């Protein structure tokens, strides 16, 4: 029987972030949401593609992540799709992130959003932007791995 505390369901994955950034360290953060946002997330209507996290006044905010309005409720009770949402982390994690982002010039990007024990969580990462040659190198490495797997499959 699987352990319930370690199981989670991935809602959305930001694959573009792994291509554009060299991921150095990841963190799990809670997110402050309204009821209609949670319902939309459970329905899988979320997009982290253009999203990023920002440090402001000792807090971390998720900006530009798109959560579609919930269809079953009227327009009056619905949420704004691209509103700024607060990320919930421990104080020592926030201090660590502040130091790395301000001193080393790193970026905070959301990698995936998932449900863990009924709570919506966001996996954010400290990333360093890749240059064009780094992107080409990672594509070449991935293609080489595919070729090796194909060759191994035939023999």
UniProtKB/Swiss-Prot annotation:
Xref: SUPFAM superfamilies: Small protein B (SmpB)
Protein's UniProt keywords contain Iron-sulfur: no
A Pfam family of this chain: SmpB
CDD domains, sorted: SmpB
Cytoplasm keyword on record: yes
GO cellular component term, pick one: cytosol
Gene Ontology BP, a term: trans-translation
Keywords: Cytoplasm, RNA-binding
GO MF term (any one): RNA binding
Annotated spans, Disordered: 135-155
Cited PROSITE patterns: SSRP
Subcellular location: Cytoplasm
NCBIfam families registered for this protein in UniProt: PRK05422.1 (NF003843), smpB (TIGR00086)
PANTHER family to which the protein is assigned, alphabetical: SSRA-BINDING PROTEIN, TMRNA-BINDING COMPONENT OF TRANS-TRANSLATION TAGGING COMPLEX
Protein family: Belongs to the SmpB family.
Its biological purpose: Required for rescue of stalled ribosomes mediated by trans-translation. Binds to transfer-messenger RNA (tmRNA), required for stable association of tmRNA with ribosomes. tmRNA and SmpB together mimic tRNA shape, replacing the anticodon stem-loop with SmpB. tmRNA is encoded by the ssrA gene; the 2 termini fold to resemble tRNA(Ala) and it encodes a 'tag peptide', a short internal open reading frame. During trans-translation Ala-aminoacylated tmRNA acts like a tRNA, entering the A-site of stalled ribosomes, displacing the stalled mRNA.
Protein name (Swiss-Prot/TrEMBL): SsrA-binding protein
Annotated organism of origin: Trichormus variabilis (strain ATCC 29413 / PCC 7937)
Lineage of source species: Bacteria, Bacillati, Cyanobacteriota, Cyanophyceae, Nostocales
Designated gene of the protein: smpB
């Amino acid at each position: 029987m699987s352990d319930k505390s370690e199981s989670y369901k991935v809602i959305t994955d930001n694959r573009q972030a792994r291509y554009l950034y060299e991921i150095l360290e990841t963190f799990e953060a809670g997110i402050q949401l309204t009821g209609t946002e949670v319902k939309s997330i459970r329905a899988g209507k979320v997009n982290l593609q253009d999203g990023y996290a920002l440090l402001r006044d000792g807090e971390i905010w998720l900006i530009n992540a798109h959560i579609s309005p919930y269809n079953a409720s009227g327009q009056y009770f619905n949420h704004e799709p691209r509103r700024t949402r607060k990320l919930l982390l421990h104080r020592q994690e926030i201090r660590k992130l502040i130091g790395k982002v301000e001193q080393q010039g790193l970026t905070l990007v959301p990698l995936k959003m998932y449900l863990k024990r009924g709570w919506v969580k966001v996996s954010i990462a400290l990333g360093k932007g890749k240059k064009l040659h780094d992107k080409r190198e990672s594509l070449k490495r991935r293609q080489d791995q595919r070729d090796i797997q194909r060759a191994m499959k035939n023999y």
